[in-house]
């Protein structure tokens, strides 16, 4: 990662830094007060109360340390410069749209968005509807729109099994994954694919890009995935119920545009399962999408990073979906 030029975006202003330091100082004063003045005296209240008090203070101290680390990480967001890629370098990409019980009308919007993604050679973009419910209407939609269809009779591994089934039937070096409702913008591939070539390219002093020589190539520098924000075109439950669509941001914005991007410096951005471009080599090395867990995306991302792959999160929304509109969908 040291060979990549990093641009720091959204540097905190003096006012913002002032409030951050106020928060850190106040938390420190609070924890010191809790440790020295509020832990129950065992001579008065007994050992059970004292031990419980110590555990509570320890939990609050850990929370404070985590908060301090969080403020430090978000002091500036770090995103690598996007390489300028020769047009003939753009590789084949498989686009997976995972669906379970979503309607054909909803899937139409996503497929339509995928078909309109800009790319130098459109023949290199292979779009597939991955349907683990094997529904005739979804297969008909795929035929109508001229995209591939992978149906499954019995999928006992949920979304992970669905995507792994698609991986076993395709071969492009890169895979873009989308949830059924996530509609990519025209620029999704043009904004994400170039980052996969950071190990092969270098930025010169004049801002142009050139291919690294054999001596300059670091064999250990491999790209794993590029995660873009999950953005929504309708208000979430909180915005809607508090009549605050124009006054408060979607709850996902803070995580995807601040926290996840802030994790770039530690090579720890989280794979969110959608709106992502992933290296097939990385997926093959970790055995595909993780199974046996309800957080297959999170675990898959960690496994890829543990294998030494470099991963980045971007703060630019390149796909937009449908926020949950009821409690059942949210859960």
Task: Please describe what each predicted stretch is.
Residues 175:
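Short aromatic/hydrophobic "clamp" motif used to bind/position activated sugar donors
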Residues 90, 97-112, 133:
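Active-site beta-to-alpha loop of glycosyltransferases that engages the nucleotide-sugar donor
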Residues 110-124, 199:
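Short, acidic, metal-binding catalytic loop of nucleotide-sugar glycosyltransferases
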Residues 1-89, 142:
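N-terminal membrane-anchoring/stem segments of glycan-assembly enzymes
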